[in-house]
Amino acid sequence: INNKGEKMTNLKKIGLTALAGTLAATTFANAGSMSVSGNAIMEYQTTEVDGGSNSVNTTDGFVLNSSLVFSGSGELDNGMTVSVFQNLFAGAVTSEGLSLDMGDSGVLHMNRWGYTSGITSIADKIPTAGENVHDDLNNATGENHDNPAVGIAKTQSDGADNLGYNYSGEMFSLSAATAEVNGAFESSVALTVNAMEGLSIGYGAGNDRPSVALDNDVTTMFATYTMGPVSVGYQVTEIDHQTASSDIDADHYGISFAVNENLSISYGENTVDFETSTSDEESSGFSASYTAGSMSFVLVNNEKLNAEGTATDDNEMVELKMIMAF
């Protein structure tokens, strides 16, 4: 009886079974874990916008801001660690990222809206107990309150897929990022030096492409110092606009004080000089936060005068938030 074909079939089955077992063993040996965390935020916010000529618009309302973060990590055979996360707000992805931790060689990652690399990672280093002084305040032309058009050291690539690299040492940390925006590349670097105990100084530089025709230079410098319960910070940001006489310079400082292990308060000011305007935009803000376990209460009062350099275009925001982390 010729059973050569049957033997070959059995050998194939044995080979496939062995291969499947090997792959399964490899997969489970290197399998990581996934977890879900998040926060539930209930807040009440009131905003008053004065556009001049007795044009005052006041809005009040309750706001629900809750998010979920799906994250996972696993160790490779070579000892490196792969991590992934995805942040969801109202069912939509607001940020996501993938990183490869190479130990002493640093971390290579790709992010979208992660604010983790390049100049964006040091865009605002001023200490605060709640929010930055420019948060949730309108601008004359409807610009976002935290991009280069209003003096903040962030680039248009924040919404694109960024390839980044971070290195952290005992004396300094280095961060770099690049992404394709409007048909060309945006790139930036940031360096932070731990000059002495409690004192950090940093510098960042990069380019911003708000449109196909524009390529602006962005630089920022900061210094922060912490001694006991007090932290102070000062930061200068410059936007060298490709269009003549359109540069933007911003000066930002702030101080925070930890009253005790639960209660902190802060105050800050930010002045933005628009070369195209005769009026400076002036923002100031007070924040207070109280934390008890996984629950926090935050009070913020921010005010902006001459929004985006437009005289008499003023607005103010007050909000009270209850944050529950889980």
Predicted regions: what they are:
Residues 1-326:
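Outer-membrane beta-barrel proteins
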